[in-house]
């Protein structure tokens, strides 16, 4: 299995270094649910600004404040502790009376707004995230500038970030041990983290191998293509390649890579043979996913940061802004810009 740091680059390995997350204010994330609260219902959506707190800690504190069980507080996604983040929490509080959440106090945390909502906020139920990052001590401004220009046109690999695999790769290591021993894992959180890490690592491997080809955006017979921003896909045929290539070049269609698991992977013929060969050595992880009935799926191979802009504060400091759809990793964008340094270079967004 290819280590995350050794995955193939789309724009070549960066020539310079830089410091990511010198302080929490250098990594700002604003969650975009894509909808507004209903204004009624048994749930309460709470928009939180936090600095130095992880999501689960804040959710547990909110549950305690509302005198409800921790499982009654949900969120769409985990946000980094070592960052300034805005995100929504959802608490199930039936009844007509609205609690005064302005009285909720937690160090490093502030309630920005809250309102009633009809439905529980479930994991993954967000449109995306807006990021504002500051890279400091940049050693090669010209290289970073050119890479930003290139990313606007060609995007970046849609890799799962190193944080998906746990500190020091612990989640992936857990999955590998589980696959080798076939010992039942009772802990639901471990099961979820390990299976996710296994599938994500296989996806990354397929993308890394595809990037070694002359043109990663070249449609081949049997590729699974999806409309940009959509989840469903269809299979490319030889007769359609020219027209499909035009639509891929126009970013109307995206070439996808497999999230291996049980069932058909989605590609056929040449594309399927390539994907199978890319992960042929990882038989144990593939068998684990099939055994645990994790369904195969697809994910776009490339990621195009939206609303990408940047501003150099000086020759060694740049502020970068962009928006990413849910499930994408800001650190996979930064990886194509600089070789990051600092304690929090690969902490989760």
Curated annotation (Swiss-Prot):
One of its GO terms (cellular component) is cytosol. It holds the Pfam family TruD. It catalyses: uridine(13) in tRNA = pseudouridine(13) in tRNA. Substrate binds at residues 27, 129, 329. SUPFAM superfamilies: Pseudouridine synthase. GO terms for molecular function: RNA binding; tRNA pseudouridine(13) synthase activity. InterPro entries: PsdUridine_synth_cat_dom_sf (IPR020103), PsdUridine_synth_TruD (IPR001656), PsdUridine_synth_TruD_CS (IPR020119), PsdUridine_synth_TruD_insert (IPR011760), TruD_catalytic (IPR042214), TruD_insert_sf (IPR043165), TruD_pseudoU_synthase (IPR050170). Its EC number is 5.4.99.27. It is an enzyme of class 5 (isomerase). Residues 155-303 form the TRUD domain. The active site is at residue 80. Disulfide bonds: none annotated. GO terms for biological process: tRNA pseudouridine synthesis. Keywords: Isomerase, tRNA processing. Belongs to the pseudouridine synthase TruD family. PANTHER family: TRNA PSEUDOURIDINE SYNTHASE D. Responsible for synthesis of pseudouridine from uracil-13 in transfer RNAs. This is tRNA pseudouridine synthase D.
């Amino acid at each position: 299995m290819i280590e995350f740091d050794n995955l193939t680059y789309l724009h070549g390995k960066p020539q310079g270094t830089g410091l990511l997350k010198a302080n929490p204010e250098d990594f700002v994330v604003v969650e975009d649910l894509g909808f507004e609260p209903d204004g009624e219902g048994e749930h309460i959506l709470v928009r939180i600004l936090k600095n130095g707190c992880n999501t689960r800690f804040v959710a547990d504190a909110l549950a305690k404040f509302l005198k409800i069980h921790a499982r009654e507080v949900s969120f769409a996604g985990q946000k980094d502790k070592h960052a300034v983040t805005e995100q929504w929490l959802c608490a199930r509080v039936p009844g007509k009376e609205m609690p005064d959440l302005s009285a909720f106090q937690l160090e490093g945390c502030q309630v920005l707004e809250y309102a009633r909502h009809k439905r529980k906020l479930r994991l993954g139920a967000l449109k995306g995230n807006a990021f504002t990052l500051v890279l400091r001590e940049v050693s090669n401004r010209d290289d970073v500038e050119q890479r930003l220009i290139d990313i606007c046109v060609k995007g970046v690999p849609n890799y799962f970030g190193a944080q998906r695999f746990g500190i020091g790769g612990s989640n992936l290591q857990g999955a590998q041990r589980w696959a080798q021993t076939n010992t039942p894992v009772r802990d639901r959180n471990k099961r979820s983290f390990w299976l996710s890490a296994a599938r994500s690592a296989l996806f990354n491997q397929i993308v890394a191998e595809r990037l070694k080809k002359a043109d990663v955006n070249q449609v081949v017979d049997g590729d699974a293509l999806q409309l940009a921003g959509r989840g469903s896909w269809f299979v490319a045929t030889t007769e359609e390649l020219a027209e499909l290539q035009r639509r891929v070049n126009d970013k109307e269609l995206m070439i996808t890579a497999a999230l291996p698991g049980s069932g058909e992977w989605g590609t056929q013929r040449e594309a399927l043979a390539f994907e199978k060969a890319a992960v042929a050595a990882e038989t144990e992880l593939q068998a684990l996913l099939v055994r645990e009935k994790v369904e195969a799926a697809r994910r776009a191979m490339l990621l195009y940061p939206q609303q990408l802009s940047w501003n150099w504060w000086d020759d060694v400091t740049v502020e970068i802004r962009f928006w990413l759809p849910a499930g994408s990793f800001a650190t996979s964008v930064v990886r194509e810009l600089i070789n990051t340094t600092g304690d929090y270079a690969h902490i989760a967004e």
